[in-house]
């Protein structure tokens, strides 16, 4: 458990580091020009452009080679299911750890086994998780591995066959959820419609959007932008913003592909 409440600072990053934060199909200027000439390739956008469009509500895990490799394995169509689940669980754990770092802490003093006083911090009470079924359930174990006693609610949202709009079929939350900080778990943000409906249900239960931290692994610019436009006070934490989201995640993780 971290002993500090570190905030991600995406505005002060160097151009070189920023270029590694958000990656699209092509990363060089020449490749970006190629993308514009090829309608099948996603358009290149820089980190600063994404943050101007979406705002500070979007927080990215600092990119390193470990995260980049996990992203690559998850996206690779030749990856076995065993390796897929293993790498997905590792990436989920990293996202959950940083999500916990966004929750409020309070200072405390403890006594060490040698009798010395130590000034530290501890979580403030009143946190819970909510998974959007089914793919969001893949993130539950990662949260429980970090917070053994945390309460987790569930919500099931599917597209209506006639209207194609997101429809809530099941929702169960802790009775006092309106007073809690919520880690909302949904690994892939594609259109953002499912998350928007889930947040709408949570706000109908009295929860303020500013108390919701959305944990995801991958997001499209459109998905993140749509969510922030609908709920400007929400926080979105993800590892990558890319024009193409690995929408096969749920099927691969649960072995139904």
Curated annotation (Swiss-Prot):
InterPro entries assigned to the protein according to its UniProt record, in alphabetical order: PRibTrfase_dom, PRTase-like
Instruction: Write out the residues that bind uracil.
Output: 247-249
Taxonomy, superkingdom: Eukaryota
A Pfam family annotated for this chain is UPRTase
Binding of 5-phospho-alpha-D-ribose 1-diphosphate: at which residues? 134, 186-194
One of the record's GO cellular component terms? nucleus
Q: Which CDD domains match?
A: PRTases_typeI
The record ties this protein, via Gene3D superfamilies, to: 3.40.50.2020
What are the entry keywords?
Cytoplasm, GTP-binding, Nucleotide-binding, Nucleus
GO MF terms here are: GTP binding
Its localization reads: Cytoplasm; Nucleus
Q: What is this protein called?
A: Uracil phosphoribosyltransferase homolog
Task: Specify the taxonomic lineage.
Answer: Eukaryota, Metazoa, Chordata, Craniata, Vertebrata
């Amino acid at each position: 458990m971290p002993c500090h409440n570190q905030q991600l600072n995406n505005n002060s990053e160097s151009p070189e580091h920023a270029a590694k934060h958000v990656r699209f199909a092509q990363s060089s200027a020449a490749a970006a020009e190629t993308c514009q000439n090829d309608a099948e390739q996603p358009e290149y956008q820089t980190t600063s452009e994404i943050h101007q469009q979406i705002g500070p509500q979007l927080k990215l895990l600092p990119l390193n080679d470990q995260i980049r490799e996990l992203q690559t394995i998850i996206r690779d169509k030749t990856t076995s299911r065993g390796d897929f689940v293993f790498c997905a669980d590792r990436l989920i754990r990293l996202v959950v750890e940083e999500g916990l770092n966004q929750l409020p802490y309070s200072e405390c003093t403890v006594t060490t086994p040698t009798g010395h006083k130590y000034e530290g911090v501890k979580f403030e009470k009143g946190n819970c998780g909510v998974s959007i079924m089914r793919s969001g359930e893949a993130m539950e174990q990662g949260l429980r591995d970090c917070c053994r006693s945390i309460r987790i609610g569930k919500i099931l949202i599917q597209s209506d066959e006639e209207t194609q709009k997101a429809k809530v079929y099941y929702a169960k939350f802790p009775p006092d959820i309106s007073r809690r900080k919520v880690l909302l778990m949904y690994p892939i943000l594609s259109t953002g419609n499912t998350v928007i409906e889930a947040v709408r249900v949570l706000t109908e239960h009295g929860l303020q959007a500013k108390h919701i931290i959305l944990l995801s692994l991958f997001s499209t610019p459109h998905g993140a932008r749509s969510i922030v436009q609908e709920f400007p006070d929400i926080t979105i934490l993800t590892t990558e913003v890319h024009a193409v989201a690995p929408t096969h995640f749920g099927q691969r993780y649960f072995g139904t592909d």
